[in-house]
């Protein structure tokens, strides 16, 4: 009998949101060393989020946008202050970072008091004010690239902030932020977010609070970053047929129509993917240039399934993007475990 100890590896348990060990994951000895590829051209690669967002530089965000206040005129933490505090933490843990990519939405325009009685056409640039209600940003750890199922991926950090989640009409109070760290597929800029790389919503009153929370997240993730990647890569070892894919899509549509009580009775996991994302994943199954089903095969891998859904949720509003991205990862892991027979909660999507 073979008594050789099997290599262990962390495994994401989507229903619990915890990390465990698994003997089936890819051994750590198989991890390739970091390689340096050409720098990513920010003007010639897919955006990490689409929806109704637009690009802006950190300089424009800092110099051309006002900072909203609370009702008592106390300043909120600026978007620029948020980004810079997380970057400081990122450099402390990971070293050199690439320039930040920023996407914003929901522009709020105004004017200075001296121009209150002017027509819009008469306003000068100096009399106009603006800020963006929602912000998402990302930057990469410089020179750190790995390969997952033949695709180069970059370790990245970033965050999301939405003023609409703060109580600006009251007195100064804690503000909400989200920070993440994870692997981003280079060819499509899809983020593969797992529960151990995402803070969720947290409250902060100062940039020091933000930096402290970022340091906690990054310091906890850094020692296991390659294990995290190999857990994702293991999705490429499991395939689903076209019939199974269609069954999953049908179940996802049915899931949205089920009453909450029925979902609870069936023991179903929490799925927050909307019909628009499901439809986009179906189109991607046929059309996506990187992850569609190949003509000579009758199946796709669960890594392809994950990327189809990750691509789909890039059309989500900024303030919901990270939660839905992580939900995609949980769903792919759940289907993998259902096929293995280790997670009955997701078996419903395969029946």
Where are these regions (language model features)?
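Feature for intrinsically disordered/low-complexity regulatory segments and propeptides
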Residues: 1-87, 94-106
């Amino acid at each position: 009998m073979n008594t050789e100890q099997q290599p262990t590896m962390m495994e994401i348990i989507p229903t619990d949101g915890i990390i465990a060990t698994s003997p089936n994951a890819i051994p750590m000895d198989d991890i390739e060393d970091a390689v340096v590829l050409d720098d990513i051209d920010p003007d010639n690669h897919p955006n990490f989020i689409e929806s109704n967002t637009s690009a802006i530089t950190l300089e424009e965000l800092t110099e051309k946008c006002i900072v909203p206040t609370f009702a008592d005129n106390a300043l909120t933490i600026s978007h620029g202050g948020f980004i810079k505090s997380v970057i400081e933490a990122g450099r402390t843990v990971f070293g050199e970072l690439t320039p930040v990519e920023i996407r914003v939405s929901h522009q709020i325009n105004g004017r200075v008091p001296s121009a209150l009685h002017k027509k819009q056409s008469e306003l000068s640039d100096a009399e106009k004010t603006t800020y963006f209600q929602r912000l998402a940003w990302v930057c990469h750890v410089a020179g750190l690239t790995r390969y997952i199922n033949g695709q180069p991926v970059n370790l990245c950090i970033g965050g999301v902030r939405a003023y609409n989640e703060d109580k600006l009409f009251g007195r100064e109070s804690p503000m909400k932020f989200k920070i993440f760290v994870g692997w981003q597929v280079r060819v499509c800029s899809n983020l593969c977010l797992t529960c151990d790389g995402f803070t969720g919503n947290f409250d902060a009153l100062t940039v020091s609070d933000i930096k402290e929370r970022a340091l906690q997240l990054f310091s906890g993730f850094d020692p296991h970053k390659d294990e995290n990647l190999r857990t994702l890569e293991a999705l490429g070892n499991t395939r689903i047929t076209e019939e199974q894919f269609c069954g999953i899509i049908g179940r996802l549509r049915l899931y949205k129509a089920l009453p909450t009580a029925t979902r609870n009775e069936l023991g179903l996991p929490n799925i927050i993917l909307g019909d628009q994302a499901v439809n986009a994943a179906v189109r991607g199954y046929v059309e996506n240039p990187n992850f569609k089903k190949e003509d000579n095969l009758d199946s796709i891998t669960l890594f392809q399934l994950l990327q189809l859904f990750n691509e789909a949720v890039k059309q989500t509003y900024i303030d919901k993007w990270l939660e839905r991205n992580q939900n995609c990862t949980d769903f792919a892991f759940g289907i993998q475990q259902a096929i293995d027979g280790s997670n009955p909660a997701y078996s419903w999507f395969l029946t």
